[in-house]
């Protein structure tokens, strides 16, 4: 197989990765599409962070053991969608998927993959600043997603509530501080990111959709990893940690209720 797109959420990768071996040829490329900090982020990063493995993302190193670093092409997906029913996805807005090599180089394989995606009707810019783009999306994911799960609110509802928007802004400031510690200066401001979310309107984040559907939430890749990185960098992460802890308990309670609902006579 020439190319494999990993379309599952980050928390499903540890189970999926060991099963990829039968479809991997000598030169198979694997495109990661997950939100949050990807498992490969510090492979080839250089400096004191080189080779760091985040246990919250790659427990026991099972993903990195199954997927060689040379195979990976990163991507950032800019689609807003909603799952209406199993196998039925409503597209709300956006048709862009950015592709890039983790080392920032320009490659023929990225160009070929982009050509196929563009031919299908998607926008597919190639980026040499993949990690910077990841942090722009993380800025929103780490703040809007958990707060939406806790409040059951849409993007526009959160942004237009002064108290809630203040919480979101505080989380974004902490995320920005982590990115700066890693040498990733964000190309957009916090206010621009908030304004962009408001334009999307009455959209439920993926984390809220998962909560309402009884599915596991993508909490560790979107929020837990940011807390872990901030702590490693000596940053307080006060607001992010509070929201993370509350959302983690929410996920645990939801999972227990889901299991109880499946018990006969419960």
Which sequence ranges carry the predicted segments?
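Internal alpha-helical scaffold of NAD(P)-dependent oxidoreductase catalytic cores
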Residues: 1, 23, 62-137, 143, ...
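Rossmann-like NAD(P)(H) cofactor-binding subdomain of soluble oxidoreductases
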Residues: 1-84
